[in-house]
Amino acid sequence: MGQARRVTVAGFVLALDRRYQPETHMWVLARGPGRVRVGMDPLGVETSGTLAQVSFVPAGTELTAGLPFGQLEAAKFVGPLVSPVSGAVLAVNGAVTRDAGLVERDPYGAGWMIEASLIEASLIEASPGGATVELPGLLADPAEISVWFAAKVADYRLKGLIAQ
């Protein structure tokens, strides 16, 4: 699918070939008809602190958007990883369960978390120039993503959740 178009927003790198769930800081990348890869954006990682452990439900588990698909243990946060999509887990990233630091070091590459099939395969298509995902609750427009992310970083800095 080629190299993702990336931009730097407020000091964080954003990949614009994927869609973002603003409340949970999860991203969704089309991997083919009805198939997506899910991971955590760099701001979600930053606000969690140093990651100690990540665990996921097993492949074959049904996913419901808004419900947990795993758990994250970090310096500043212990809690659920919330699915941005409904469907079924096709694969989990075993490398991340062995080395949670992959999510910090390479959130858009080796640090992906799960691959899933979607309930409605017609909602997603992969295109040669990037991915188009049309799912409720996910930001899709690159300009909208950048504005949301910059505002969230400013808010978190104001609240002292991340460094200036």
Stretches found by the model and what they are:
Residues 55, 73-74, 79-83:
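Small beta-strand-rich domains/subdomains or short beta-sheet motifs embedded
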